Amino acid sequence: MNQTQNTTVNTQLEKTLPSFSIVYETENLSSVELDNIYRSLASISQQEISPEQANEFLIIDAGNAPPEVIEELCSKYPWLTVEKATNIGYYEAKMLGAKLVTGEIVVFCDSDCEYTPNWLKDILSTFLKGPEVKVVAGETSTAIRNIYELAIASNYFFPRFSRKEEPYPTTSYFLNAVAFRREFLLENPIPTNLPLYRGNCQLHCYYLCKLKGHQIWKHPLARAKHEPPTSSFIFWRSLLAGRDRIYRQYIKSIWQANPDLKDFSQVNINQEVNKNHSIKDILATTFRSPFKLRMILSVIREKPSRIFLLPLALPFILWFEILRSTGTMITYLKPNWLMETYKQKEEQESQSQEVISASPAK
């Protein structure tokens, strides 16, 4: 198909698509380099379905990007709208955006991801299957350019891209590459008042699919490339992942008993974690296999020569798992210590950055 024919097809498709809005955040820039937001928005600007067709392209700016960067981006991409929202987390930013926009479909993407040109088209066109399609995700994976990134790809939570070509039902999504029918999302919101660092999406998927019987669709050609986290960020990310896996277990058990519960602010999960546990339960939760064989095999299958580099990546993989296990053990002893310590660190770094920004240039 030549370029003229392709343009005609896309124009015809645009006429049949539901109205949509795009919600974007800056909170994830805390885990990667600032340059990522430029590459991310550049990839979105080159979509086959232009972001200018959206009712809104709304950036929820929590202050993770300098004001001059946001101003520069708004000048370059006039279809951007910015909503300032200080002291707001990742999931709160997403749900705030969903409430503010007006499209029938709300599309979520992140500042640390780059998207293939067909990404938005494939996500939106999947909704044309019928009104029963409520959630459509794309596939997200990480780049592999060195040994560290090979370790991330073999142990982090983003799998490699599948070899599928058609949309398929699934029970999971990543919030950096997913779209919802807006009314459905507002009726079944992503929980934001959970005592977790990350993992709200996992629990949202559990709620939607296991408890409520809904289905998530995934389009394998709608691909997002996620920038691997920096080595400084992965330290705390791994510790807190060990903490979060305990909390997720308790939240699931609470949800099983009360599937309609949406406000966890009154639930004292710390008290549940503090209860006496058998040594067997603690060891089973803490010490898990550090090697995710399925992920490792998919990394090698994608490029067989990586098998020779894998031994060099193993120390990183073991380090990540040691951190997770350490986070789990600390949480059994002092349930909220890790989260409180991390928040204090973040607050101190934020205050230091404000002081630097306020200092007159020499």
Question: Where is each model-derived feature located?
Answer:
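N-proximal low-complexity "stem/linker" segments adjacent to membrane-targeting elements
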Residues: 1-43
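Acidic donor-binding segment of Leloir-type glycosyltransferases
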Residues: 41-84
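Glycine-rich, basic loop-to-helix element that forms the pyrophosphate-binding segment
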Residues: 85-101
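Short aromatic/hydrophobic "clamp" motif used to bind/position activated sugar donors
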Residues: 106
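Conserved donor NDP-sugar-binding/catalytic core segment of glycosyltransferases
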Residues: 118-150
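A recurrent flexible, glycine/aromatic-enriched loop bordering the glycosyltransferase active site
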Residues: 161-180, 195-198
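Acidic donor-binding loop at a coil-to-helix junction in glycosyltransferase catalytic cores
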Residues: 196-207
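Non-catalytic, C-terminal membrane-associated alpha-helical segments of glycosyltransferases
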Residues: 239-244, 260-362
